[in-house]
Each structure stands twice: as C-alpha cells, then as structure tokens.
Amino acid sequence: REVAGLPEARGDGAAQASSWLDRVFNVQSLQRALRRMRPKGHAAGIDGWLGVLLRWAPLHVQQQYVMMVRRAAELLQFPPIWSVNLVTHIPKPGKSVSRVEKMRDLWNCPHGWKICTQMMREEYNRVGDRCIPGCQRGFRACCDAAEAAATATFQTEEATTLCVPLGRLYLDLSGFFMGVVRRLLYEIEGELGVDTRLTSCVRAVHEVMSGRADTAYGLSECWPV
C-alpha cells in the first residue's frame, strides 16, 4: 500500500462493490493488464515503481491490489503521484539539442495508473466494438494494415463512382494521448455510452495532471498539463 499509495481496502458489507466495479476491476482483468508489464522496455514513472513486480507477486497480493484499486475508483481518490508524469526529451535527428521545443517529448506515467487504465481499457473496447462499424478497419484487434489500406482504397473508389466529395473522420483516442482535448474526449465518451463512472475515474486523474522534466540538473518543478 505504501508503494501504490492506494486507499485502504474495506471488507465490511457497507463497502461491497457495485456491479460496474465488479465488471471493470477484478483479478482476471488485472492479470490481463499485467501481461503487458515486462521486465524490459517499460520506463518507470516518477515514483520508480515497476508494474512487472505486481505481475510476479503472489495471487493474494494481486487480490489485495484489486480491492484497493476498486476502493480508489469508488471514492475517486487515486494516489496523487499517479497524476504526475515524468517527461524525457529525446533529440530529433538534425535538430539542435539546445532547443527543447525541437525535441521529442516522451511522457511516462506511473505504472500503477498504467495498470489501472489497462483494466479500464476492456470496458472502452466493449463500447468501441459496439459503436465502430464492421467495415471500418485500422489498428484494431484482429485487423492488419492491409485491411486498413483496402478500406482507404474502397472509399476512394466510392468517391470516384459517386462523383462527389467524400469525407471520413477518424479519431484515435485509445492511447490517452496528450494532444487530445479532454472536453472533447469526455463528450464523445458520454455520447457513445461509456459508463460515466468510468469517465469520472479518468477525469479524477486528468484534472490535476502535471509534468516534471528529467534534465541534466535533475527533475524540474511540476507544471500543470
């Protein structure tokens, strides 16, 4: 609990989880999320904690973690450190390293929040599978780049056949990218039928989100994101 910063899980009847908590936060969804946690290739967040440690932990520890995440989601009281992103700047080829705006910025969130969003991702995928038409492809499960190229070709032929302009809008919001306007994100989720309590969990962390840059002189001060 000291590492994760999660609230104490309660075992009394008054704290019995509701159906949406049962559906989203359970041991099975946690273990599926932990499969993405690997020893290498995952930079630690600002707290330095590696999610793969929870993957290696015994079952009773994972069960306790799930209970604490459920409690945090129920109260909308997530660890404050989950809202702080570690920012690393990587030079681009041929660009000056003295101009920070010319560098690529990599945002690393704490692994606790990463695991939590991976558990919530299944609910977002459920809504996406219901709303996205079967003819639309792209980077979706069981769909490859060839299908995406074929879809674009068919749309071009459709416009040519009809002799009219044809517009298609694609929004990729699945990765919680920093460039996504949050107000737009919340509105889209509401229109598509995402559980508002799930959106509230994401919003609770996003509303107080900040960043700290890793520099040659140590970590910078926090700035709001």
Go through each PLM region and give its residues.
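Conserved pre-catalytic core of RNA-dependent polymerases
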Residues: 3-225
